[in-house]
């Protein structure tokens, strides 16, 4: 049985350790100094790959390839629970991640970077909680509030990093996460726009939900790679265009993440870390009402 610590009377600043979850081109271990691989077992199975621990400018970081370093795990088959639990288990306090997205808005052009603030979950097959009633899991049922969906302070750090580096980035967006691996139909794409979606991808959910349930401060940098298929007169999204646009812009995301690591390390996050854990505890029912 896993126990979750809800109370902490320690008044000293809590140390930070930053998990970085990346897709193709953003799982390069060379961004870490003094790196070493660590295989972690979790109550929820194996993560997508071994964790790579190291430092970025003296700050402890952990790198995980969301789809495996061979990129052979499709979005539906990513073990999101094992990934998040493994990063939590090695002491991460923050998660900063990258994701490739289609744009549902004319003003978010292919190649643009976006720091999203909310999501719409259209997945159908993915486990969304650690509190599943099994013996090895935390006790109770967690009804986690998902507003705000992302850590606002972590989002602001990412935006500050982009500004300092003079890399344009849209400061908010709602991501629609679909099950995949197929792309949307045109009718679906139009529907998501009508719902208020700005971006569409296949990985934010349940990753962002599980990160919050694990008490981690989660922020994301999205690369808009295409216009999905809602624009009339356009052929729509295809894998080759996605990969090309992602590769052309991945260095900008790396620069933002590295800059953000330094910014996070300079600040005291004790209150945010404790509040994130307390949010989980306050919304977990462990007995009969």
Curated annotation (Swiss-Prot):
Binding annotation for phosphate: 24, 66-67, 99-100, 203
Keywords tagged on the record: Cytoplasm, Glycosyltransferase, Nucleus, Purine salvage, Transferase
GO CC list: cytosol; nucleus
GO MF: identical protein binding; S-methyl-5-thioadenosine phosphorylase activity
Major subcellular location class: cytoplasm
EC number: 2.4.2.28
Catalytic activity reported: S-methyl-5'-thioadenosine + phosphate = 5-(methylsulfanyl)-alpha-D-ribose 1-phosphate + adenine
UniProt record, GO biological process: L-methionine salvage from methylthioadenosine; purine ribonucleoside salvage
UniProt-annotated binding residues for substrate: 202, 226-228
Tissues with expression: In embryos, expressed in the fat body and visceral mesoderm.
Enzyme class, UniProt record, top EC level: transferase
Residues annotated as site: Important for substrate specificity: 184, 239
Observed effect of gene inactivation: No visible auditory phenotype.
InterPro entries: MTAP (IPR010044), Nucleoside_phosphorylase_d (IPR000845), Nucleoside_phosphorylase_sf (IPR035994), Purine_phosphorylase-2_CS (IPR018099)
Lineage: superkingdom: Eukaryota
Pathway: Amino-acid biosynthesis; L-methionine biosynthesis via salvage pathway; S-methyl-5-thio-alpha-D-ribose 1-phosphate from S-methyl-5'-thioadenosine (phosphorylase route): step 1/1
Localization terms from the record: Cytoplasm; Nucleus
CDD domains per record: MTAP_SsMTAPII_like_MTIP
Purpose of the protein: Catalyzes the reversible phosphorylation of S-methyl-5'-thioadenosine (MTA) to adenine and 5-methylthioribose-1-phosphate. Involved in the breakdown of MTA, a major by-product of polyamine biosynthesis. Responsible for the first step in the methionine salvage pathway after MTA has been generated from S-adenosylmethionine. Has broad substrate specificity with 6-aminopurine nucleosides as preferred substrates.
Recorded family membership: Belongs to the PNP/MTAP phosphorylase family. MTAP subfamily.
HAMAP family membership: MTAP
Subunit structure: Homotrimer.
Protein name: S-methyl-5'-thioadenosine phosphorylase
Source organism of the structure: Drosophila melanogaster (Fruit fly)
């Amino acid at each position: 049985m896993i126990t979750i610590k809800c109370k902490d009377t320690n008044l000293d600043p809590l140390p930070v350790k930053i998990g970085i979850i990346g897709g193709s081109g953003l799982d390069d271990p060379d961004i870490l100094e003094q790196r070493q691989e660590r295989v972690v077992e979790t109550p929820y199975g194996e993560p997508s790959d071994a964790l790579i621990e190291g430092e970025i400018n003296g700050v402890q970081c952990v790198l995980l390839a969301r789809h495996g370093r061979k990129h052979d795990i499709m979005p539906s088959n990513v073990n999101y629970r094992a990934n998040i639990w493994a990063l939590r288990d090695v002491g991460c306090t923050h998660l900063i991640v990258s994701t490739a997205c289609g744009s549902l808005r004319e003003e978010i052009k292919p190649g643009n970077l976006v720091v999203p603030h909310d999501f719409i979950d259209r997945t159908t097959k993915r486990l969304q909680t650690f509190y599943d009633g099994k013996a090895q899991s935390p006790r109770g049922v967690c009804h986690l509030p998902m507003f705000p969906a992302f850590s606002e302070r972590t989002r602001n750090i990412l935006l500050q990093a982009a500004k300092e580096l003079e890399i344009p980035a849209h400061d908010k967006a709602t991501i629609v996460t679909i099950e995949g691996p197929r792309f949307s139909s045109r009718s679906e794409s139009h529907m998501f726009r009508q719902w208020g979606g700005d971006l569409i991808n296949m990985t934010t959910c349940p990753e962002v939900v599980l990160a919050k349930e694990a008490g981690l401060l989660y922020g994301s940098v999205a690369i808009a790679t295409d216009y999905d298929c809602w624009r009339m007169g356009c052929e729509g999204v295809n894998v080759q265009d996605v990969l090309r646009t992602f590769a052309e812009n991945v260095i900008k995301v790396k620069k933002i993440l590295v800059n953000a690591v330094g910014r996070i390390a300079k600040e005291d996050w004790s209150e945010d870390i404790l509040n994130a854990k307390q949010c989980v505890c306050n919304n977990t029912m462990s007995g009969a009402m």
